Amino acid sequence: MIKDYVNDKNLQIAMTEYDSEMDLDHVVKTQSGDQIGTVTQVYNNTTGAGEQVYAVVKNPNEKADKVQEVTVLFRGSTGPDHFWEETADFWNDWAENDAVIAKRIMLQKDPSYQDKSTEQLKASARALKDIMEKYPNAKINVYGHSLGSMDAQYSMASLQTDQVKRIQQAYIYNGPDIYRILSPEQRKVVDSIKTRIHNYADPDDPISMVGRDMVKGSIGSVGLVYYVDSTKEDFVNQHMTYGYQLDKNGKIKILSNTSTVIYNDYLLQMDNYTLLKEKLSEGGYTKEEQLFLDSEQAGIAAASISLMSTEGKSIIKSIRD
């Protein structure tokens, strides 16, 4: 019996990457019944590296240069239950990528001075660039789980400055954070779109905690990190997000942490502030607009500092008690 993922729109989209019928012209639907679009490009082990990347568009008959939005799915590791049917995929994913990358991340205590990726990550990056070239005017939405999360992180980090601006949003789940094995140039690229990348990790899933420090949270990580407040499942189900639960607002329930929730909120507000500043600057600032921007920036910073202080006091009190 197939279990249900929690009914979060973006998680549901991400997990369509495991659809057994995923192939060219396949109509992609989430488990909850929402239609995402049609697969128009497939990159399945094109160079023997094991990558599986899919481009999905709403109208496959539309001219490529007219397409406004493309969903890119990076498939995660082939599960142990498929070892006999997909032995080559299983070996590629687990032995030549998951294990290798995990080892490199754990040995790399500080950010690297060079790219320490694998061939699958590089093949995935080529696939994303190819998709973006085919659809030159489209905004790109990126999704990935497990190894697919790492493929997605690396692919975005490998884009050029003019290309990365087209990433509209990215939602990645239960994969190691590869920030510390990226080159300095690649880290700058993902940092430039940090608030567009939503990086979910389950503290009860050992795989998704590789390369992470719960105290640092989103600091020194790819994107905004969210630690999921999950229920306990067996090893496989925990990793496959079946421990995820929704809060009262219908969003994935996350753990509160100064360096995640408050820091993430600060970054998002500052991102909105920057967009507002750019819009107002088009005609030059009036004195009133400059005063408004200064007070807005100060207000965001003050509110975040206050929340961090309150959170810090609560943590100290809980430790003392």
Predicted regions: what they are:
Residues 144-148, 152:
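Gly/Ala-rich beta-loop-alpha elbow adjacent to hydrolase catalytic centers
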Residues 14:
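Substrate-binding/charge-relay-adjacent region of secreted/lumenal peptidase catalytic domains
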Residues 62, 66-69, 129-141, 157-321:
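Serine hydrolase/lipase
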Residues 2, 9, 18-143, 162-169, ...:
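A conserved cap/lid and substrate-binding interface adjacent to the catalytic center
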